Amino acid sequence: MTSAEKSATRNIYDPSALPDYDTQFIKPDELHQFEKALNAPAAAPLVAINDWRPINQRVRKNRRTKPRRSKDETREGVLYTVLKWPFLFIVFAWITVLGIAYALTRLYIFLYEQCVTWRGKRERLRRELSVQTNYRDWLTAAQALDTHLGNQKWKETDEYAYYDHLTINKVVAQLKQARKAAESEVHNGRSGVSDLPAVEDLCALLEACVKNNFAGVENPRLYSESYSGTKDLVQEYIDEVQACMQLILDSKQIPAEEKYQHFKHLDTNFGRTALCLSGGATFAYYHFGVIRALLDNDVLPEIITGTSGGALVAALVATRTDEELKQLLVPALAYRIRACHEGFTTWVWRWWRTGARFDTVDWARQCSWFCRGSTTFREAYERTGRILNVSCVPSDPHSPTILANYLTSPDCVIWSAVLASAAVPGILNPVVLMTKKRDGTLAPYSFGHKWKDGSLRTDIPIKALNLHFNVNFTIVSQVNPHINLFFFSSRGTVGRPVTHRKGRGWRGGFLGSAIEQYIKLDMNKWLRVLRHLELLPRPLGQDWSEIWLQKFSGTITIWPKSIPSDFYHILSDPSPERLARMLHVGKQSAFPKIQFIKNRLKIENTIMQGLQQSSPGGDRVLLPILSRRLQNRAQEHADAMVERLDHSFPERHSDYKDESHYTEVSDSLSTNSSRPHTPDARRGSIFEEMRRQSAVFFDDPDMYGDEDAIAT
């Protein structure tokens, strides 16, 4: 190790090198206001008897009042009372048996993979993959493993059952031809879309194909058959779409208003990408490694949501710039994580007196450093351009959850939302959200009502993100320990293919995967039966079945691999050495997903750039995070981008006829295609069409509804 490397290693363990390490952002008066709000009496709802009678005053009521029912009407009945506990005992006993069988099945699959799959050279290449510390070296090792396993041949073949390769072939050919004609028109100097028919055709083509998961090109299965990348045809399609949009964006002849309407249409159809950080107590520190991997490769989404422990990480990311994050996401950050610094006797006595292990005001003081003091959601967005979202659940079980962000609660103080999202019953008592007034002082938010852990109901708020920000592509970093135990992808996941039978097999063989799926779905079924029959007890007034039966995955799900000692330290502060390991594991778990995320953001960032530069008024200034990302992408990936056409471009052969926006491609252009592809022969009979349809598979992770259970 050179002297420079030794110095760099010392710096990442030196707390004094952290930005604002000794800064105390929060003011004592703000903590006092928070403590006062916590100790205030519960807010009573103001209810009038009718429209004309006053409230909070004595009134003469009718003496004939109906007696209030003291029982839950849905739980009355002789059979319910007699059968509830025996049925509950039998079901729990059966779930226990299924749990033991599941553990034995997973042990069998583990031994099967170690003894049958990972042997010889492939095992050596896999070990080299697991020790890489940066994405460039990891990608080199992944490509070597793909070459050894024969995955490169799979990339070169267009046909695949999980996307429509025929449509993608035709669209790529049409885009290339339309881009060539549009460049010729733009270079001639004419202005206005009406005077540029080729540009108008190109815009129509883009509006037809720039959509979320168009023809299945964003199906995770396309990235689950190799360690690096996807089908060559899919990569060519993404590069060509980005090049065509860049042509429209750079054109001086197209009026800004027409550009804006075009990119607004694309933005609505394509949607946005969000990073979702799950809860999981101290397991949430694995998120730091995931964030660091995405940050180093310029693929960190602007929309970030966090729940419970993930909310603390999301708050740190949303309140710091990229440069500050690169200095903060190092092992020395462990010196600032002091939430569990109290001794055993202290927290036991507090739990006995208050019902919570940790002190809320002390946690507010510790958490405020990660949020840069009493920063609000609006202030964080204005400082970094990132959109922070935090899930909070009201202490009243009948009230809806809230996704706090700069739209729904712009003046809400971030650290109060983070505390509320982490207020697990028995760990931290429900918390009052705080809002910042115009004079800078703090006051209770939402009439002083209290909130608690968001992961109890909505660990991953996909629906709310789609409602507020048109998010339809989610990157989920999932570290909940009770969910990670049941994570198993029988056919591989993004960047982690099944090596058995060259990716065509099942983990542990078909029998092992079938048994695993059956047991997991059976446990899921019985938990749902108990919940729908209202047989589950509700300790602390909480329906705990939600921690199993909600949806915990996204379009891309990152699962950092935990170790047994993490369960022992689940409520303790990490040491620098343990945080260094969690950073490495988090980065390793994110590396296989980066190429998929890059392809998604390549199109999304170009759309956002078009909206920013062509929007009317004074909104044409690029956000710092977007402009910096676009500059880095242009510098690092210039060799991979499709260049402008100055001469005849070799086209792919297509039999696609003129329909809607598409036109026929000349056969002379197909002979010089630089990439081997599957012939686009027209199907000659109904039997051929039936054969093709029967070979198409639909990978639907939501087949059991929005509240999918234990992760699959």
From Swiss-Prot:
<feature type="transmembrane region" description="Helical">
    <location>
        <begin position="85"/>
        <end position="105"/>
    </location>
</feature>
<feature type="compositionally biased region" description="Basic and acidic residues">
    <location>
        <begin position="677"/>
        <end position="686"/>
    </location>
</feature>
<feature type="short sequence motif" description="GXSXG">
    <location>
        <begin position="306"/>
        <end position="310"/>
    </location>
</feature>
<feature type="region of interest" description="Disordered">
    <location>
        <begin position="649"/>
        <end position="686"/>
    </location>
</feature>
<comment type="similarity">
    <text>Belongs to the PLPL family.</text>
</comment>
<feature type="compositionally biased region" description="Polar residues">
    <location>
        <begin position="1"/>
        <end position="10"/>
    </location>
</feature>
<keyword id="KW-1133">Transmembrane helix</keyword>
<feature type="compositionally biased region" description="Basic and acidic residues">
    <location>
        <begin position="649"/>
        <end position="664"/>
    </location>
</feature>
<keyword id="KW-0812">Transmembrane</keyword>
<dbReference type="GO" id="GO:0016042">
    <property type="term" value="P:lipid catabolic process"/>
</dbReference>
<dbReference type="GO" id="GO:0005811">
    <property type="term" value="C:lipid droplet"/>
</dbReference>
<dbReference type="GO" id="GO:0006642">
    <property type="term" value="P:triglyceride mobilization"/>
</dbReference>
<comment type="function">
    <text>Probable lipid hydrolase.</text>
</comment>
<dbReference type="GO" id="GO:0016020">
    <property type="term" value="C:membrane"/>
</dbReference>
<dbReference type="InterPro" id="IPR016035">
    <property type="entry name" value="Acyl_Trfase/lysoPLipase"/>
</dbReference>
<dbReference type="Pfam" id="PF01734">
    <property type="entry name" value="Patatin"/>
</dbReference>
<protein>
    <recommendedName>
        <fullName>Patatin-like phospholipase domain-containing protein ACLA_029670</fullName>
        <ecNumber>3.1.1.-</ecNumber>
    </recommendedName>
</protein>
<keyword id="KW-0472">Membrane</keyword>
<dbReference type="GO" id="GO:0004806">
    <property type="term" value="F:triacylglycerol lipase activity"/>
</dbReference>
<feature type="region of interest" description="Disordered">
    <location>
        <begin position="1"/>
        <end position="20"/>
    </location>
</feature>
<dbReference type="Pfam" id="PF11815">
    <property type="entry name" value="DUF3336"/>
</dbReference>
<keyword id="KW-0442">Lipid degradation</keyword>
<keyword id="KW-0443">Lipid metabolism</keyword>
<feature type="active site" description="Nucleophile">
    <location>
        <position position="308"/>
    </location>
</feature>
<dbReference type="GO" id="GO:1990748">
    <property type="term" value="P:cellular detoxification"/>
</dbReference>
<keyword id="KW-0378">Hydrolase</keyword>
<feature type="active site" description="Proton acceptor">
    <location>
        <position position="453"/>
    </location>
</feature>
<dbReference type="InterPro" id="IPR021771">
    <property type="entry name" value="Triacylglycerol_lipase_N"/>
</dbReference>
<feature type="domain" description="PNPLA">
    <location>
        <begin position="275"/>
        <end position="466"/>
    </location>
</feature>
<dbReference type="InterPro" id="IPR050301">
    <property type="entry name" value="NTE"/>
</dbReference>
<feature type="compositionally biased region" description="Polar residues">
    <location>
        <begin position="665"/>
        <end position="676"/>
    </location>
</feature>
<dbReference type="InterPro" id="IPR002641">
    <property type="entry name" value="PNPLA_dom"/>
</dbReference>
